[in-house]
Amino acid sequence: MKPLKFLFAALAVIIVTDTARAEDGTWPRTVKHAAGELTIEKKPLRIVSTTPSLTGILLAIEAPVIATAATTPSILTDDKGFFSQWAEVADERGVKTLYSNLNFDIEAVIGAEPDLLIASATGADSVLQHYAELTAQGVPTLVVDYSNQSWQEIAIELGKALGLEKEAAASIARFDAYAAEAAKTIKPPAGPVSIVAYDIGSTYSVGRPESPQGQLLQALGLKVAGLPEELRPQITRRSDFEFISRENLPAAVQTESVFLLRGTEKDVAAFLADPVLANRAAVKNRQVYPLGPSSFRIDYYSGRQMIDAVAQALKAP
């Protein structure tokens, strides 16, 4: 696998090349997206997002977001339902709540008078079922599938559509530089580490090395181990993480260091106190670390928070 810092650099080269082709600012431009094709008549100035999962990327590439849907407030959000990793930036830029609790509101969308709406094809914040309604109302809608793309790839896609190619490239470069600087302060464990999603909705899973979280740890100089080969027949569901039963968790945690997805210090304490894990080396040596609440999905802002969490946990003497 390519080290992530080199992947970032490659993406930046791609986007700079595309910028050279599109930087003349030619409008309209036609873009393909997850629901078809859209002709954008001029550079968007009033963007609304119905997908909080993408709002952070839009903010990172300096898109003119005027409003975003909000999810249900939780430990992952502020009191409005904006994800905590980008909520402050959104507030500073005057981003309003389009609607709350992911309850789609076509009247709120129309009332915002967007010149472009960003929607997702998958996930709890998808409004794909309302795509026909949106287009019938004359709302230019761009649908993005974030289920199988990194935030950098999505930034490139959005940058091309919005005429923000340079801004997308700059966001990737900033992130790459931030990771590189943090890596200088880290003393990586000698052996590989595991990423564990521990008791999230009563489920247990182990991160794959090629997951966004795994790639980011590797960019910081760590080696990431996936699920042991002998447990593969026990996998109940697979995505970026491979799900197993709680009974199989001890056999899954064979590394001497563990990072907890979406983990806080409270989660670390629960992991260390779990009797089924008492004999694991990571538990015995208390080398279990939180990746922070926002690490469940990596974008520009949550990725930086995860970098900070790892740097804090593994700070070189």
Summary of predicted features, one role per range:
Residues 154, 160, 248-317:
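Structured C-terminal subdomain patch of bacterial secreted/periplasmic proteins
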Residues 37, 126-202, 296, 300-317:
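Extracytoplasmic substrate-binding proteins
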Residues 73-78, 125-129, 145-157, 192-219, ...:
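Extracytoplasmic ligand-binding site segments that recognize negatively charged/polar headgroups
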